[in-house]
Amino acid sequence: MPFALGQRWISDTESELGLGTVVQVEGRMVTLLFPATGENRMFSRAEAPLTRVIFNPNDTVESHEGWSITVTEVVEKDQLVVYHGTHSETGETVSLRETLISHNIRFNKPQDRLFAGQIDRLDRFGIRYQCQLLRHKLASSDLLGLQGPRVGLIAHQQWIAHEVGRRYAPRVLLADEVGLGKTIEAGLIMHQQLLTGRAERILVIVPDTLRHQWLVEMLRRFNLRFSVFDEDRCVEAYADNDNPFYTEQLVICSLELLRKKKRLDQALDADWDLLVVDEAHHLEWSEDAPSRAYQVVEALSEVVPGVLLLTATPDQLGHQSHFARLRLLDPDRFYDYDAFLTEEQGYQAVAEAAEALSGEKKLNDSAINSLTELLSEKDIAPSIRLIQANEVDPEQQQAARDGLLQELLDRHGTGRVLYRNSRASVKGFPKRIFNPHPQAMPEQYVTAERVNAMMSGKKTPQAKALEALSPEKLYQAFESDSASWWKFDTRVDWLIAFLKSHRSKKVLIIASQAETALSLEEALRTREGILATVFHEGMSIIERDKAGAYFAQEDAGAQALICSEIGSEGRNFQFASHLVLFDLPLNPDLLEQRIGRLDRIGQKNDIQIHLPYLEGTAQERLMQWYHHGLNAFELTCPSGHVLFNEFAEELTQVLCEDDADAMTQLLNHTQHKYKELKQAMERGRDKLLEINSHGGARAAALIERLAQKDNDTHLVGSVIRLWDIIGVDQEDNGENTIVLRPSEHMLFPTYPGLPEDGVTVTFDRETALSRDDIAFISEEHPLVQTGLDLITGSETGTTSVAVLKNKALPAGTLFLELIYMADASAPKSSQLYRYLPPTPIRVLLDKNGNNLATKVDYNNFEKQLSAVNRHIASKLVNASQPLLHPLLAKGQEQAQQGLDALLVDARASMTSQLTAELERLEALKAVNPNIREEELEYVRNQMAELNGYLDASQLQLDAIRMVLVSHV
């Protein structure tokens, strides 16, 4: 290369240094000073990664003094360049020597980089275009946020997330039965809200015992990095902000923390977009005395736009508390408990109409009359005729049924606020097999009960019943050696024998009290050396996690995990299928929670429920009531709480006194009422609610689409190629897995999210679900998103020169390929990407300016191209400049036509969708007060904002490739 003092060059490998000046040429070496950074670089003259900077006529060049010149003539003298032209401000004729050009000039625009000789490798141009196409595909998908989480494609979960996650500020109660995956539904909704920009700041309130579990679950399944806040963390955060909640975007904390007025005030002032409350059935309320927990959540729900309440038992703690939770979501809608009860009485007619529509038979007169009355403002006659017709396409009939069903669900009841799936409507659960094991009552307990009976005159019947259910507690109360009960308790003998005969099985044991759990662990360890671990509320979160992990280990882990009632809440152990109930809780909901630790979606085996009970005691009588009255061991019992409240007095009496006639009478009454409630639930609101909650055929279609995306081999190829280009080491690890590691030759100094010691990944959902240590890669995964951002956010691939070997074309024929981006700058929360996502517009010009992009497929064209040495490419560009400048202007015109067409479509789509949504909401609001005015106002404002953003849309040249035909 011919170097001379004062010449301006740019580094091909360190463009951030700015413009360099040759300060020394000696022998085979050349030294450049980069004044913008004050750094020197020495290069070999023969192989210097440098490009000579020479501007062209019509370019605007800035001097180091700050003024600019529009170049009209370029003169070279003594190997240095002088630019003649017009002063950009005064209009005077001026000259500018290259030594006086601004040191900070960066060649960011593709055309500037091309003319400056900063030409990328051919494959980088291709990967940049593929990245832009992938970003466009992801942003324009209505499945955004559902594809990436490491969860099974379970219809009702994905359906609820799809319906709720795309709303503005959703306010809903997720009330699926135990084991149906409410945490996953909440995670999917949060993931969707964050990816679509509808939410940026989220506060999750969970029981203290579940904080760490939520933290791990959100990271492992959804790649959401929450921070756990407790009092210590709040104190530490003062160094960064007076309000600790402003130091993180995604926060998990307990209700205990927010009971403190100072912390609650700070949380109220923290501008959250979404509030999530787990175990919401603990929020007790009465009109006169709402609980402190309820008041905390109520205060937050008044200032946070979006609210998700999670509860497995909507009526636990009473129907009034269920109403109170709905009141948190929409106090204007649920303003009066009596009015709510009156409204519920009208649900049966709606449910009957929905039942008729969800079948396949023709509608009877009663169903038609109900539909006509319920949908009086709609013209439903055409749909009715279609359903009743004989020779009509079944798909059309089904569409008519679905349409009317959707109208019905939209207009009546709590369908938009409450989602509740039951096991009856969700398939795939194992059987529950109940195994009672009667044991003889130890004499020590008989004596303790006799003594207690003489001393318990003033105790309430419920207190007496609870004592009768735990004879070991009574014994401990009267004996100094509180630990000795497990030495003679026949249930402990049975438990040891059972574990010894099932050594290869994992067994979950649940007892009411933490002290009982600890004593059982001691008994197993000291009497037989059985490996067991304990799980109770007195342990820290980390201690509980370690215990759970020890139990989960297949080879060296504990055979048994012994949990207390409270300690096991919210924890799931589907890998075990044997459950031992060492005692029974005096609440059918708590019994269901115990069984729900194993009876969940994902359980592969039938669940064996074992109950060692003491014969002739309160334990046996409670077992009979649960088993023969409620069938609560082998089936879920949604009416359990109602039945318990109704028969609490009789049940308590039977538990305290052994009266066979009273027991028989109680069982008869319970069975009769159980059947009544079961039939009423079948007829009433639950049926309608479940039709809306599980999504039916629409949910199945959604799952089919997600499964098709899982099988997209094109995505796998694109992502692997992306990692290849960036320089990520990829090692095939077998079993559909790859190990990714940073390498020393990566394009970028760091790859955020890629650990130094590597990470194992898979593109296969089933593989990811079977192993927690493997990341599930989809187009939504941070490792993919980061890769796309690294490429598209840098200059990688913005310029390229290639040779087309095609003898059908004259040698020297020139093509210019331009990739423009439709650039509509708008905040993510505006949802503009739904109508105008970042869209690449490809223009392929021949030398006459004709656009061949629609005639010449990109992939076919790409296959015919060959790379060109960078120095040769630079010379080819310089020689072709007279042709390239007018072609660039022509390309801008062609791309503008493409943008105009995109804008027309985007505006039409936006207007059509939002107008339809607004009209739908307005129609619904007239008949269903469940529609909030904020939702309507949001749609109106969104239309106005989006029109403004579309008006301001511009074209951005993203990449440029010059192609020359060669016959060599």
Curated annotation (Swiss-Prot):
One example GO MF annotation: hydrolase activity, acting on acid anhydrides
Residue span, Helicase C-terminal domain: 491-641
Key words, A-Z: Activator, ATP-binding, DNA-binding, Helicase, Hydrolase, Nucleotide-binding, Transcription, Transcription regulation
Stored SUPFAM superfamilies: P-loop containing nucleoside triphosphate hydrolases
Subunit structure: Interacts with the RNAP. Has a higher affinity for the core RNAP than for the holoenzyme. Its ATPase activity is stimulated by binding to RNAP.
Chain's role: Transcription regulator that activates transcription by stimulating RNA polymerase (RNAP) recycling in case of stress conditions such as supercoiled DNA or high salt concentrations. Probably acts by releasing the RNAP, when it is trapped or immobilized on tightly supercoiled DNA. Does not activate transcription on linear DNA. Probably not involved in DNA repair.
Protein name (database record): RNA polymerase-associated protein RapA
Entry-linked InterPro entries: Helicase_ATP-bd (IPR014001), Helicase_C-like (IPR001650), Helicase_RapA (IPR023949), P-loop_NTPase (IPR027417), RapA_C (IPR022737), SNF2-like_sf (IPR038718), SNF2/RAD54-like_C (IPR049730), SNF2_N (IPR000330)
Motif (DEAH box): 278-281
Domain Helicase ATP-binding: 163-332
Source species taxonomy: Bacteria, Pseudomonadati, Pseudomonadota, Gammaproteobacteria, Alteromonadales
The species this protein was found in: Shewanella denitrificans (strain OS217 / ATCC BAA-1090 / DSM 15013)
PANTHER family for this protein: DNA ANNEALING HELICASE AND ENDONUCLEASE ZRANB3 FAMILY MEMBER, SWI_SNF-RELATED MATRIX-ASSOCIATED ACTIN-DEPENDENT REGULATOR OF CHROMATIN SUBFAMILY A-LIKE PROTEIN 1
Transmembrane segments: none
BP GO annotations: regulation of DNA-templated transcription
Superkingdom as given in the UniProt entry: Bacteria
Chain positions recorded as ATP binding sites: 176-183
